[in-house]
Amino acid sequence: VKRPMNAFMVWSQHERRKIMDQWPDMHNAEISKRLGRRWQLLQDSEKIPFVKGAERLRLKHMADYADYKYRP
């Protein structure tokens, strides 16, 4: 069972598509670096919708997999 996405992952899922549309030949590693830098530049207020989205996913995950315990 996969862990639920965190706020960065929720945000980056949408942003990654935008970058790939603009630069289809860009390597995944470079896209990830850009996403990380852009996320760090966002204001906390801009992150709120993604934090809330991640929290919804976390709660759903807890309901769906009540006995789940992360084991790396």
From Swiss-Prot:
It comes from the Eukaryota. The keyword Ligase does not apply. The keyword Transmembrane does not apply. One of its GO terms (biological process) is neuron differentiation. Gene3D superfamilies: High mobility group box domain (1.10.30.10). Pfam families: HMG_box. It is found in: Nucleus. One of its GO terms (cellular component) is nucleus. Residues 1-69 bind DNA. Keywords: DNA-binding, Nucleus. This is SRY-related protein ADW2. It comes from Alligator mississippiensis (American alligator).
